[in-house]
């Protein structure tokens, strides 16, 4: 950081010049690289990209029309409508024509990675559904210091991204380990789960045998407040909550929820509707001292087991393989309380349940700490990126 400041002071005493993006990069139309079939498979070799949030949509086995990018010849794929973009340094195909493939014009004048980072400081939000690169976005200016300063800035910022990437890789590795142990603890597969019943003290029962399965009551986003009666909305089960919650993200007015149905401390809340067949059915243990009103796209399970033992089971492949038989697929997938009640779960002695929950808690705590560290490093990266690339 000090080295960069010294270079800027010495080489740019009168400030830094600004250049338009179209003076620094050219674009290639994506037409020749559009995938013919959307029959993707993870076993295929060529990724199919979008410039949107999803980035990699899947993998194709098509051999023609592959764009050859590499660490030596990287590109930026730019969404012409949303203006989101991604750095790409591997071979790929694209999903649609609604993007541009950006390339560096002159490596002697500008570092392409620097341009990519500088583009991240352009805080433009599209308001019209139109193509933006040619008519507008390419005319935006970015600061362009001497090439050696660009490279120093890239090196400094990439040290953050490299650390963040390594931490993300560890999170993914730990999550895979956790999934492995979850399945192992509950039998490995359906037959293995059934064999657990042969162990003295164990049994395999259906969810309906655990206790009442109660559907929540309807409320909408407009009913939600920042204070009041705790409530659990089904959408937040996917985006906010984990396997357990002590406090709620949202609330209802105190006089609103007289007709609501509640999760009490130790109850398991299971989401019964979603946009895909796999995530549906995950759940959390409500551990708040105050009851939480539950949305009607969720179910409340009353039971007499170790709560986290059930919550972790809801993350197992064994559970989801059974549940999908009772899921009605459509624009929104869903299942009934009756369907959930038919799913089997291995019941082990209480001390064994506690032991399993404790081991999995250790994984989850470690993963949570890593994710918080990633968030902190990401904020540091964005702070330094803004500071360095605005030259203020």
For every predicted segment, state its role.
Residues 93-100, 128-146, 291-297, 328-351:
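A short glycine-rich beta-alpha junction/loop motif
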Residues 22, 89, 105, 110, ...:
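Long compositionally biased, domain-poor regions of proteins
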Residues 16-25, 94, 113-116, 154-160, ...:
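Short, structured motif recognition centered on aromatic/hydrophobic residues
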Residues 5-11, 33-38, 125-129, 139-146, ...:
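Short, recurring structural edge motifs at helix starts
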Residues 22-60, 73-80, 221-254, 264:
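DNA target-recognition patches
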Residues 1-20, 144-201, 347-392:
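Amphipathic alpha-helical coiled-coil/heptad-repeat segments
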């Amino acid at each position: 950081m000090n080295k960069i400041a010294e270079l800027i002071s010495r080489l740019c005493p009168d400030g830094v010049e600004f250049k338009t993006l179209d003076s620094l990069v050219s674009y290639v139309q994506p037409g020749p690289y559009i995938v013919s079939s959307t029959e993707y498979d993870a076993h295929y070799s060529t990724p199919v990209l979008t410039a949107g949030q999803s980035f990699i949509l899947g993998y194709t086995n098509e051999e023609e029309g592959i764009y050859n990018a590499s660490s030596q010849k990287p590109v930026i794929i730019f969404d012409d409508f949303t203006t989101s973009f991604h750095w790409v340094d591997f071979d790929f195909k694209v999903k649609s024509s609604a993007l541009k493939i950006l390339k560096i014009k002159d490596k002697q004048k500008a570092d392409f990675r620097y341009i990519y980072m500088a583009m991240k400081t352009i805080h433009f939000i599209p308001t019209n559904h139109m193509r933006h690169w040619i008519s507008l976005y390419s005319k935006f200016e970015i600061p362009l210091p001497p090439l050696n300063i660009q490279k120093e800035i890239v090196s400094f910022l990439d040290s953050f991204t490299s650390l963040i990437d390594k931490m993300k890789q560890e999170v993914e590795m730990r999550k895979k380990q956790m999934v492995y142990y979850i399945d192992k603890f509950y039998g490995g597969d359906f037959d293995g789960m059934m064999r657990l019943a042969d162990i003295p003290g164990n049994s395999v029962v259906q969810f309906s045998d655990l206790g009442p399965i109660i559907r929540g009551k309807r409320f909408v986003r407009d009913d939600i407040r920042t204070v009041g009666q705790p409530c659990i909305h089904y959408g937040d089960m996917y985006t906010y909550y984990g396997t357990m919650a002590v406090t709620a993200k949202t609330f209802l007015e105190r006089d609103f929820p007289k007709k609501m149905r509640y999760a009490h401390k130790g109850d398991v809340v299971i989401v019964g509707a979603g946009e895909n067949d796999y995530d549906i059915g995950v759940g959390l243990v409500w551990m708040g001292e105050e009851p939480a009103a539950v949305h009607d796209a969720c179910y409340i399970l009353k039971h007499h087991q170790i709560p986290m033992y059930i919550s972790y089971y809801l993350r197992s492949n064994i559970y989801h393989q059974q549940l999908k038989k009772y899921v009605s697929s459509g624009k929104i997938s869903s299942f009934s309380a009756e369907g959930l009640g038919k799913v089997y779960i291995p019941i082990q002695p209480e001390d064994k349940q506690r032991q399993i929950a404790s081991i999995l808690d250790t994984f989850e705590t470690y993963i949570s700490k890593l994710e918080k560290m990633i968030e902190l490093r990401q904020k540091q990266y964005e702070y330094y990126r803004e500071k360095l690339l605005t030259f203020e």
